[in-house]
Structures are given as C-alpha cells and as structure tokens.
C-alpha cells in the first residue's frame, strides 16, 4: 500500500511540474500552496497502466491554460524499486 501511495504521490508532483513547464514564460494558474491534491487523481486501466484524471479547480485551470482537454494528453510512467518510487509525466499535443 505504501509503495502504491508513493508512486501516486510522485505522479501528482510530476504532473504539477510538467504543467508548469508547459506554461514556461507565464505565471502559474494555481500557486503551489493552493493546489488541492485530491483534484489530481492517479487512475489505472485494466492492464494497470497509469493515467491522470483531473477534477475541480485544477481541471478548469488546465483547460484555461492549455486549451480544451481534447487538444492535449497526459502521459504517465511510475516505477518502484524497494521503498523508492519515481514518476515521469509529459503533457503532449493530442492533435499531432
């Protein structure tokens, strides 16, 4: 359980960093201390592949800053090694 929670938390943090990088040169839409982490949900499909589901203010701010959610896609990778977890997130153009 702790291993799963660590990977999910790492993915949420990585999402915030990827979103910030996508807005390079512009101020963040939500300050780091204002993020409601419950609005960033790590989900898995039936093959246990991770994805990010956004809710509430975070979802609205992403659409405002990045455009309609149909125009971008969040790619997630989570890895574990013993007690350590790491995640990578990329926000890419879904229309390309």
Regions found by a protein language model. Give the residues of each.
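Core catalytic alpha/beta fold that binds nucleotide/phospho-ligands
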Residues: 1-96
């Amino acid at each position: 359980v702790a291993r799963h929670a660590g990977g999910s938390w790492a993915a949420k943090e990585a999402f915030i960093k990827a979103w910030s990088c996508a807005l390079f040169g512009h101020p963040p839409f939500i300050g780091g201390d204002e993020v409601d982490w419950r609005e960033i949900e790590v989900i898995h499909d039936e093959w246990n592949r991770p994805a990010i589901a956004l809710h509430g203010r975070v979802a609205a701010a992403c659409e405002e800053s990045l455009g309609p959610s149909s125009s971008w896609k969040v790619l997630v990778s989570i890895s574990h090694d013993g007690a350590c977890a790491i995640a990578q997130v990329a926000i890419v153009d879904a229309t390309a």
